[in-house]
Amino acid sequence: MKFVYLVVTLLVSLSADPQKSSLTTVFGDLDGDNIEEKVLMSENKDGQRMLQIFKQNNSSEWKLWHSFDSIVINSDDGGAMGDPFTELSVSNRVISVSHDGGGGRFTWRYLHKYRYDKKDKTWRVIGATIAYLDKSKKVETLDYNLSTGKAIYTANCIGDDENQDECIDIKNFTFYVKPANPPLMKNFKIGKNKIVIPKFNIEMYY
């Protein structure tokens, strides 16, 4: 899956809370009613980031619908590469949030997808695409659809690590790990969720 970096930085004050500033705002229909919602990534004076979703009322005023405080990684948690946030987008009722970070020998990239469950009236994590790069050994990718349970893992050996002989090239290894229910967005912790690649016993975190 390709990562497209189209970040729009607004840096304007939120009228609802003078302690927060808006960093990125996107629009799209998230609940299937053909009316666009507003999705806003904000940051308070302490650097804590929040993802907020707004709906318009009958007076065309934006009212807060849902809010999440663990979906966007803070600016100082990206390692030597700096601010890890790269993109916020909405398409086909899905919110996508991209990050990358690391530094030196190791770098990482995350793309997570979230969708509103109209039946349960809650938000769930439905997809994760992860890439890890060890410049001296290998690059790994995992594309995981939490709705269907389908996961595709790839590993490409690179570099000159002394343990390079232990590295195995793996191309599009497909397996299924379907949770009983996709994780709730409100409880989700980016990079803290383990999945084990069967046959190879490799651990990945999304």
Predicted regions and their residues:
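Sec-dependent N-terminal signal peptides
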Residues: 3-14
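Blade-edge motifs of beta-propeller repeat domains
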Residues: 20, 59-82, 127, 181-184, ...
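Beta-propeller blade termini
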Residues: 21-30, 82-93
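Acidic/hydrophobic-patterned starts of short beta strands in beta-sheet-rich repeat architectures
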Residues: 30-43, 90-99
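Short, surface-exposed coil-to-beta transition loops
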Residues: 35-36, 48-50, 83, 106-111
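Short glycine/acidic-enriched loop and turn motifs that connect beta-strands
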Residues: 44-47, 102-104
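Beta-propeller blade repeat segments, especially FG-GAP/WD-type strand-to-loop junctions
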Residues: 48-67, 114-118
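Acidic, small-residue rich beta-repeat scaffolds with periodic aromatic anchors
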Residues: 92-206
